[in-house]
Amino acid sequence: MERTPFTIATGCGELSGWVSGAGPRVLAIHGGPGMNFGYLDDAVAELGAHYQVATFQQRGLAPSTEQGEFTIAEAVADIAAVLDGLGWDTAYLMGHSWGGHLVFHAAVGIPERLAGVLSVDPLGAVGDGGAAAFGAEMLARVPEASRDRARALDEKDTAGEATPEEAHEAFSLVWGSYFAHPPAAPPMPHVEFSQPANLGLWTDVTTRLPELEASLASITVPFGVLVGELSPMPPSAGVESAERIPGAWSHIEPGAGHFVWHEAPGCLLAAMDRLVADA
């Protein structure tokens, strides 16, 4: 799949990414927060069968700026800036995991720029978003011999005290937990982390959850939620969020984990096709 790179100026630094494919326009938002965007390549490739898809590295890591306030408002403004830079008046928005949470905020904040929104296995927008259940399940799926180490590293990371090496080790210990069948997980991709982006955005996520939950009923753009039946993120996190949005729908993909396109190839494209057809 041929990629055309782009770099877009914002009020604070530049954002870099690439675009490929042909068809209705989709902007893909990666997870994290504070994580590199390369893991999303296979998802973008699946969507590229029917769509022109752009994706970009969120601020905090190269090749985008490493500087920022690392707030929800800034992240939503960055989505609008990328759309501006691409010359896209409107586009469909697809977000995964943390990105799947961010797209709820985008649907509230910049609805005039969005043709529709697909949230994929997200941190939800009701209650704590499923965060506590997700964290517990991630640790429960780690082999017992490594569980105490994984827990200790997670606590350091949450406190903002983990070194880059410890953050990488922590992710490697829980990598299998993202999948429906952890022993069969694929090799871990190359990962990078921005601690300032992670800490700043998680703090703002937690602070703004009540406000976001209260705003769900005001969302007017076409909205779909796709979740994995066997994801460590409880499917209810996404499903209950969709139930609060007028006209929204949700789909639980049987046998899929957090990276739904890996264990159920084609389900992401089918969900986007449904969103576009409904819109």
Describe each model-derived feature in a short phrase.
Residues G11-E66:
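Conserved HGGG/HGGXW glycine-rich cap/lid loop of the alpha/beta-hydrolase fold
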Residues L27-G31, H96, V227:
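The conserved beta1-alpha1 loop
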Residues T55-M94, W98, A270:
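Active-site loop/oxyanion-hole signature of alpha/beta-hydrolase fold enzymes
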Residues D89-A133:
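Conserved hydrolase catalytic core segment
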Residues V117-K156:
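Flexible "cap/lid" loop of the alpha/beta hydrolase fold
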Residues R151-T206:
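Conserved alpha/beta-hydrolase catalytic His-Asp/Glu region
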Residues A184-E240:
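Conserved serine/cysteine hydrolase catalytic core
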Residues A248-A279:
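Catalytic active-site module of serine/aspartate enzymes centered on a nucleophile-bearing elbow/loop
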